[in-house]
């Protein structure tokens, strides 16, 4: 659960979430 979310953020979510903030 947490591991999958972190891997996804490193991919694209992360990038998208950082730009939105």
From Swiss-Prot:
It is an enzyme of class 4 (lyase). This is Putative sperm adenylate cyclase. One of its GO terms (molecular function) is ATP binding. The keyword Nucleotide-binding applies. The keyword ATP-binding applies. It catalyses: ATP = 3',5'-cyclic AMP + diphosphate. Its EC number is 4.6.1.1. Keywords: ATP-binding, Lyase, Nucleotide-binding.
């Amino acid at each position: 659960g947490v591991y999958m979310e972190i891997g996804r953020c490193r991919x694209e979510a992360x990038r998208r979430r950082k730009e939105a903030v």
